[in-house]
Design a protein with these regions (language model features):
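Signature of alpha-helical transmembrane segments and their immediate interfacial
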Residues: 1-38, 432-434, 500-548, 588-589, ...
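Solvent-exposed, membrane-proximal periplasmic/extracellular interface segments of envelope transport
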Residues: 5-7, 62-138, 196-217, 238, ...
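Extracytoplasmic/periplasmic membrane-proximal domains and adjacent transmembrane bundles
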Residues: 10, 52, 123, 169-344, ...
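Transmembrane helices with small-residue packing motifs
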Residues: 16, 24-62, 106, 120-129, ...
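Solvent-exposed, non-transmembrane alpha-helical starts
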Residues: 20, 59-66, 103-114, 143-147, ...
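Hydrophobic transmembrane alpha-helices and their membrane-interface caps
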Residues: 30-35, 347-414, 472, 865-954, ...
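Helix-loop junctions and hydrophobic alpha-helical segments within the transmembrane domains
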Residues: 324, 331, 335, 410, ...
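Transmembrane alpha-helices and their membrane-interface boundaries in multi-pass membrane transporters
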Residues: 399-413, 434-454, 461-501, 618, ...
C-alpha cells in the first residue's frame, strides 16, 4: 500500500486539528444529547382510516347495500389498499380502510387525500337523507396525558363547565395538539307526552313541534338605515330555559293549550346515555390531551403539569382532578431505565477493555467510546431520532461492536511497539494493515442490519432506528479508530513495550491445543460442527415463537363484551359488579372505566375499540409487574366464574403493532346465515383445545325487530303516509328533536317523546292512536299490523364479504404462534370441508407476524449481495468468500443453546438479532482470513500461516466477543430486548469459538494444506 493515502499518518501530522475535531465532536454530542426528544417507544404510522356515515331510519340491510357497499366498491380502486373492513348497523355505516403494511409513511397523507376524493366522486349516488360520510384519518393520534375530573356534590353539567374552562385555558401550553373530552353527557330538555291524552284532545304532536319551532326560530328581522346609523332589529321569543317552554301557550285546533298542561317538561341528560367514563368507580369527565407531532414529550409534559397545577388550584372544593395517564412521566421513567442500562453497558465494555488490554491500551479504547457516542447523538438529533426503547437498545448493542475497531488498532500498535517501532510508525502501520479489513468487517456488519432498515412493514417502521443507530455507530467507530485512536494512542501508550511472553497461558494453550487438534482432524472437526448445526436446526422446533412481547408497563386492560343486543344500562350494571370486586384490591393503584366504548388511545400500540353499548373496557394500573401478574390471574378466574355469559379478556398492554386477542380466525362467505353456521361449527371445534381461553365472536346474534306493516291504501285514505307513521313512532319510542335552547356555550336539544310508562313497552305501539290531518284519532292497528321478526343488528364485512371473526386468548404460558401451529391441522381439515365460496383465514398474532417478516425475507437477498460484494472487494477470491461465509450460519447453534434452556421465545426482534449475527460473525472471519493471507505473504508456510494468524487474532477476537456479549447483559433483563440479547449473546460466543476452531480446520481442508514434518518447518519471518 506504499504511496496510498494513510489517514492515520495524516492525523498524526495534523494533531492540533484532530484534537480540535475531537473537542468539537464531544461538545456537539453533549448538546445533542440534551436536545434529543424522549419517547417510551418509537412511533409508527397507523395505516388506517375510518369513514362513518349515518342514514337515520334505514334498516341494516338497506344501509349495507346502499351505503357500505358503495363505499367499499369505490375503495377497491386504491392501489395501496390492503383490505376494507366494514361494520354496518341500522342507519349506521363504519368503513375501515387498511393500507398495505409496506406503504411508506410519507405517502399516506396523499393516499388519504385520494380516499376523500374518491368518496366525493360518489356522493351523488347515495340515498337522500344521508349524513356524511365523515373521515377520520387521525386514527393513530396518541393522547398521552389523560385527566379525570370528578365532582363531589356537583351535577354533570356543573362539572362539565369546569372541564370546559380548563380545556380553554390549557390552549396556551406550548406544543399542545388535540384535546378531547371523554364521558360528557349532553343535557336534554324532555317533553314527555301521553299519547292517549294527545289522542283524546285530538292534538297532533307534529302541530306542537311546528309551533315551538316557529317561535324559537332565529330569523333576521332586518336593519334600519337611519341617517348616519345602522340599527339592527331583533325579535324576542327564543327559549332560554325549560321554564320558558313550560309557559308557552300553543294554539292547536282553534284552542289554546299551555305546553306544561299537555306535556311533562324536565331537564336531564341524553337517554340512553352516551359512552360513560369513570375514575376509580366514580362518574367522571375525562380530558385527553395530545402533543403536537415532533414535540419533546418531557418538555411538553412539564409545561402541561405546571399549567394544570395552576388551573386546578382555582377550582372549587369538590372538584377532583386525577391523573389517568401521564406519558411524560412514563417516558421519563422508561428513558431513565434505558439510559441506566446504556451506562451499565459502557462500564462493562470499559472493564473488559482495561482487564484485557491493560491500563494504557484500555484507556485509548475508553476514550473512543464517548467520541463515537457523541457523533451518534449528533446524527440522531439532526435526523429526528429520539431517545426511546429501540434507539437506546441499539446504542447498547452497538457498544460491544464499536470498540472492536479501536481494540484492533490498539492491539496492532502494541504489537509493532513490541517490535521496537516508534509510536508514530506503529500507528501508521496499524492503518496500513488493518484499516481496510476493519472497514470491510464494519460494512459487512452494517449489511447484516439492512433487513431491519429496509423492512417497510409497521413492525419495520417500529424498529427502524435499530438499523439507523447501529449503522451510524459502526461507521463512526471505524472513523474514530483510524483518525482519533492513533492520535490518542501516541499520547497515552508507552514508547517502549515489553514483548509478551512467547509462551501462551493456560487458556491460550487450551485454545492452541483445540485448534491444532481441529486442523489435524479436520474432517472430524467439520463433521462435529455440521452435526451440531443440524441438531440446532432440528431443535428450533422446541423454541417458542412470539411476535412482540407484552409491555412492561403496569397497566392491565379488561374487556367486557355483553350479548350484542344488550343496552348500555346492562353494560353499566356488569361494570358495577366488577368495580365492586376490584375497589379494595391491594395490588391496584387506580383504574379508569370506559362504558360503551374502548379506552382512548393513550398508548400508540393500543388496539382501539369502536363505540358499542354492549362493550366496556377498564384500564387498571397495578402497583408493579409482580402485582400485575398476580392481578391478571385473579381477574381471569373471577370473571370466568362470576360473569357467565359475558365475554371477558384480561391482558397487559402490547408492544409493537396492535393485535388484540392473539388467536383469531375469520370465517367468510356469501350468505350471512351460512357464515354464522360455519363460525359456530369452528368455534365448537376450537373449544376442545384446553390451551384456548374464552372464545367470542365479533358478531353473531340476531336481534328482535318489531315490524309495522302499513296497509298503504287505507293509510292514504286517512291522509297518512309511511313517513308520518314512522316519525310519530320514533318520537314516541326514542324521542324526536323539537328545537334547541341556547344555554351559554351549549345547545340544549328539546326532545319530544312518550312518557316513561308508555315508552318502555312494545304494547305502546300496538295501542298507539294516530291523529289524522282532519283531527280524528285512529288506532294504528286500524290500518297496520305489528309483528316480531329477527334481524341481524350488525354485520362485519371484510373485502365485501360477510365475515365473522372468532377470537380467543391463550389460557396458559403457551405462545400464540405455537398454539396456532398446533391448531393448523384442525383448521386445514375444516377449511377443506367448507362449500365453495366459504373459507377460514388465520388472523391475530400469526397474521401480523407474517406481515412483519415477509418484507424481511424479501430484503435478505440484498443483504447477502452486499455482504458478498464487500467480501469480494477485500478478499478477491470466491473460495475465501465462501469460507468466510460458511461460519455465519453456525451462530444458530449458540442461539438455540441460549434460548431453549432459558425458555426465551423467538420473537420478531430476536429474528432481527439473528440476521445481524451474520454480519458480526463474518466480520471476525474476514479479519482472520486476511491475517492468514498476510502471514503467507510474509513467507510463512500455509500451515504455519493458519496457525500463527489464528493465534495472533485469537486475543482481539475473544476480546471483541466478550465486549459484544457482556455489553448486552443490561438489556437481557428487558422484556423487549431479552430474546434478542440472549440470541445474540449465545450466537456470538459459539460463533467466536467456531471461528477460532472450525474455520482453521475448514481452511486447511479446503486448500488441502498438510502439517509439515518437523524437519520441514520453515523459519518464521
Amino acid at each position: 500500500m506504499k504511496g496510498s493515502f494513510n489517514l492515520s499518518d495524516w492525523a498524526l501530522k495534523h494533531q492540533s486539528f484532530v484534537w480540535y475535531l475531537m473537542f468539537v465532536a464531544l461538545l456537539m454530542g453533549v448538546f445533542s444529547y440534551m436536545n434529543l426528544g424522549r419517547e417510551e417507544d418509537p412511533s409508527f404510522t397507523i395505516k388506517t382510516m375510518v369513514i362513518q356515515t349515518r342514514w337515520p331510519g334505514a334498516t341494516q340491510e338497506e344501509t349495507l347495500k346502499q351505503v357500505t357497499d358503495r363505499i367499499e366498491k369505490k375503495l377497491e380502486e386504491l392501489d395501496s389498499l390492503d383490505y376494507v373492513k366494514s361494520y354496518t348497523r341500522p342507519g349506521e355505516s363504519t368503513v375501515f380502510v387498511f393500507l398495505k403494511d409496506t406503504t411508506s409513511a410519507k405517502d399516506i397523507p396523499h393516499i388519504w387525500y385520494l380516499v376523500h376524493k374518491k368518496i366525493d366522486d360518489i356522493r351523488g349516488s347515495f340515498p337522500q337523507g344521508l349524513q356524511g360520510p365523515s373521515f377520520n384519518d387521525e386514527f393513530g393520534d396518541v393522547f398521552g396525558s389523560v385527566y379525570a375530573f370528578t365532582g363531589d356534590g356537583l351535577s354533570m353539567r356543573q362539572l362539565r363547565d369546569y372541564v370546559e374552562q380548563v380545556r380553554a385555558e390549557i390552549r396556551s401550553v406550548p406544543g399542545l395538539g388535540k384535546v378531547e373530552m371523554i364521558g360528557q353527557q349532553d343535557e336534554v330538555i324532555y317533553l314527555n307526552f301521553s299519547t292517549r291524552k294527545l289522542a283524546a284532545l285530538g292534538i297532533d304532536q307534529r302541530q306542537v313541534v311546528q309551533s315551538l319551532q316557529s317561535q324559537n326560530a332565529v330569523t333576521p328581522a332586518g336593519v334600519i338605515e337611519a341617517g348616519p346609523e345602522r340599527i339592527s332589529v331583533r325579535t324576542s321569543g327564543q327559549f332560554a330555559s325549560e321554564k320558558d317552554l313550560a309557559d308557552v301557550n300553543l294554539r292547536l285546533n282553534d284552542r289554546f293549550y299551555r305546553l306544561a298542561d299537555i306535556a311533562e317538561i324536565s331537564r336531564g341528560y341524553v337517554d340512553p346515555a352516551r359512552p360513560l367514563f369513570r375514575f376509580n368507580g366514580t362518574p367522571a369527565i375525562g380530558l385527553a390531551i395530545a402533543m403536537q407531532k415532533g414535540g419533546n414529550i418531557q418538555a411538553f409534559g412539564k409545561a402541561l403539569h405546571e399549567r394544570m397545577d395552576e388551573l386546578t388550584a382555582d377550582l372549587p372544593v369538590g372538584v377532583g382532578v386525577h391523573k389517568v395517564s401521564d406519558q411524560a412521566e412514563v417516558v421519563e421513567e422508561a428513558v431513565g431505565g434505558f439510559t441506566s442500562a446504556l451506562f451499565e453497558a459502557v462500564i462493562i465494555v470499559l472493564v473488559v477493555s482495561f482487564i484485557s488490554l491493560g491500563m494504557r491500551a484500555g484507556l485509548v479504547v475508553a476514550c473512543s467510546i464517548p467520541l463515537v457516542l457523541a457523533l451518534v447523538f449528533v446524527f440522531m438529533e439532526y435526523s429526528g431520532i429520539t431517545m426511546q426503547r429501540v434507539s437506546l437498545g441499539a446504542l447498547i448493542i452497538a457498544l460491544g461492536l464499536l470498540v472492536d475497531d479501536a481494540m484492533i488498532t490498539v492491539e496492532m500498535m502494541i504489537t509493532r511497539l513490541e517490535k521496537g517501532e516508534t509510536k508514530e510508525q506503529a500507528a501508521t502501520y496499524a492503518y496500513t494493515s488493518t484499516a481496510f479489513p476493519m472497514l470491510t468487517g464494519t460494512l459487512v456488519t452494517v449489511a447484516g442490519f439492512v433487513p431491519i432498515g429496509l423492512n417497510a412493514s409497521s413492525a419495520g417502521e417500529y424498529t427502524f432506528t435499530l438499523f439507523a443507530v447501529i449503522a451510524v455507530a459502526m461507521l463512526v467507530s471505524w472513523v474514530v479508530a483510524v483518525l482519533f485512536a492513533p492520535v490518542i494512542g501516541v499520547h497515552i501508550l508507552s514508547a517502549k513495550v515489553k514483548p509478551h511472553d512467547a509462551e501462551p497461558g493456560r487458556i491460550g494453550r487450551a485454545f492452541n491445543g483445540g485448534m491444532l487438534w481441529a486442523m489435524r482432524n479436520r474432517w472430524w472437526a467439520i463433521g462435529i460442527t455440521v452435526a451440531l448445526f443440524v441438531a440446532s436446526v432440528f431443535s428450533m422446533q422446541f423454541v417458542q415463537n412470539q411476535f412482540f412481547p407484552s409491555s412492561d408497563r403496569p397497566e392491565i386492560l379488561v374487556d367486557l363484551n355483553l350479548p350484542q343486543n344488550a343496552s348500555i344500562n346492562e353494560t353499566r350494571k356488569a361494570v358495577d359488579r366488577l368495580e365492586a370486586i376490584i375497589k379494595d384490591d391491594p395490588d391496584i393503584a387506580r383504574w379508569s372505566t370506559y362504558i360503551g366504548q374502548g379506552a382512548i388511545r393513550f398508548y400508540l400500540p393500543l388496539d382501539q375499540q369502536l363505540e358499542n353499548p354492549y362493550y366496556a373496557q377498564l384500564v387498571i394500573v397495578s402497583k408493579g409487574l409482580e402485582e400485575r401478574s398476580a392481578l391478571i390471574q385473579r381477574l381471569q378466574k373471577r370473571l370466568r366464574d362470576d360473569f357467565v355469559g359475558i365475554g371477558s379478556y384480561v391482558q397487559p398492554l402490547e408492544m409493537g403493532p396492535p393485535v388484540g386477542r392473539p388467536i383469531q380466525y375469520r370465517v367468510s362467505g356469501k350468505d350471512i346465515d351460512q357464515v354464522r353456521k360455519h363460525a359456530i361449527e369452528l368455534a365448537t371445534l376450537l373449544d376442545q383445545n384446553t390451551h384456548l381461553g374464552e372464545i367470542i365472536y365479533d358478531w353473531n346474534e340476531p336481534g328482535k325487530v318489531l315490524r309495522v306493516d302499513i296497509a298503504q291504501d287505507k293509510a292514504r285514505q286517512l291522509g297518512l303516509s309511511s313517513e308520518d307513521v314512522a316519525q310519530l313512532m320514533n318520537s314516541v319510542v326514542s324521542g324526536a328533536s323539537v328545537t334547541q335552547v341556547h344555554d351559554d356555550i351549549y345547545l340544549i336539544n328539546v326532545v319530544g317523546r312518550a312518557e316513561d310508562a308508555e315508552r318502555g313497552t312494545p304494547e305502546t305501539l300496538q295501542n298507539l292512536q294516530i291523529v289524522t290531518p282532519n283531527g280524528t284519532s285512529i288506532p294504528l292497528l286500524a290500518f297496520a299490523t305489528v309483528r316480531y321478526e329477527l334481524e341481524q343488528p350488525l354485520v362485519w364485512r371484510r373485502d365485501r364479504k360477510p365475515t365473522i371473526t372468532i377470537k380467543a386468548s391463550v389460557r396458559d404460558e403457551m405462545q400464540p404462534t405455537d398454539l396456532v401451529k398446533q391448531l393448523a391441522p384442525t383448521i386445514d381439515k375444516f377449511n377443506a370441508g367448507l362449500p365453495v365460496g366459504y373459507k377460514v383465514a388465520t388472523g391475530g398474532t400469526v397474521e401480523e407476524s407474517g406481515k412483519a417478516q415477509g418484507p424481511i425475507a424479501s430484503v435478505v437477498p440484498l443483504m447477502l449481495f452486499l455482504m458478498a460484494t464487500f467480501l469480494m472487494i477485500q478478499l478477491h477470491s470466491v473460495q475465501k468468500m465462501f469460507l468466510v461465509a460458511s461460519v455465519a450460519p453456525l451462530g444458530l447453534i449458540g442461539v438455540v443453546l441460549a434460548l431453549i434452556p432459558t425458555g426465551t421465545p423467538m420473537g420478531f426482534v430476536a429474528i432481527l438479532g439473528i440476521l445481524a449475527l451474520i454480519g458480526i460473525i463474518i466480520r471476525n472471519s474476514v479479519i482472520l482470513v486476511t491475517q492468514i493471507d498476510e502471514y503467507e505473504v510474509a513467507g510463512y508456510s500455509p500451515w504455519d500461516a493458519v496457525v500463527q494468524a489464528t493465534e495472533h487474532r485469537r486475543r482481539p477476537i475473544l476480546l471483541t466477543a466478550a465486549a459484544a456479549s457482556l455489553g448486552m447483559i443490561p438489556i437481557a433483563r428487558e422484556v423487549f430486548w431479552g430474546p434478542m440479547a440472549y440470541a445474540m449473546i449465545g450466537g456470538i460466543i459459539i460463533a467466536t469459538l467456531l471461528t477460532l476452531l472450525f474455520l482453521p480446520a475448514l481452511y486447511v481442508a479446503w486448500y488441502k494444506i498438510r502439517e509439515p514434518k518437523p524437519d520441514q518447518q520453515e523459519k518464521r519471518g
